[in-house]
């Protein structure tokens, strides 16, 4: 993470900059899925918006296993926003599959069983924002 936006050692931090080429973690069999998903999380410990901001890369054949974030569990009542940047994938729900391609966005509220699969020939790259849902 690079600090910048002012003199060499500013008294007040004005902004943070990060690269998706650094700090990548690998998650094999995420939620009992197939293959390994590469995840880059941004601004952990710095961001105050109440969200997690990640970039995920699923190689061909990789999946995030189906799972549910439960609204009755304060540690797991997440809402997830997916935005497809590159590649093609499939969002998997209990009784439906939804094709995803670059430019598509998907919002999954708590209590919805869901997963993700890359059935294409190239990496599937997704921006994922995870946060607690607000009041209706």
Descriptions of predicted regions:
Residues 41, 54-75:
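Conserved short histidine dyad/triad with adjacent acidic residue
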Residues 95-110:
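Short acidic-glycine-tyrosine-enriched beta hairpin
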Residues 77-89:
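Glycine- and acidic-residue-biased ligand/ion/polar-headgroup-sensing regions
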Residues 47, 90, 110-135:
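Ligand-binding loop in jelly-roll beta-barrel domains
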Residues 1-55, 136:
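A short, N-terminal "cap"/entry segment at the start of jelly-roll beta-barrel domains
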């Amino acid at each position: 993470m690079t600090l910048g936006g002012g003199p060499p050692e500013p008294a007040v931090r004005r902004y943070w900059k990060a690269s998706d080429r650094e700090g990548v973690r690998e998650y094999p069999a995420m939620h009992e899925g197939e293959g390994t998903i590469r995840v880059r999380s941004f601004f952990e410990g710095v961001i105050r918006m109440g969200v997690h901001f990640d970039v995920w890369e699923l190689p061909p054949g990789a999946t995030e296993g189906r799972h549910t974030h439960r609204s009755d569990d304060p540690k797991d009542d997440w809402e997830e926003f997916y935005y497809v940047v590159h590649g093609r994938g499939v969002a998997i729900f209990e009784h439906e599959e939804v094709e995803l391609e670059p430019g598509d966005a998907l919002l999954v509220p708590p209590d919805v069983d869901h997963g993700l699969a890359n059935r294409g020939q190239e990496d599937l790259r997704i921006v994922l924002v995870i946060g607690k849902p607000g009041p209706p």
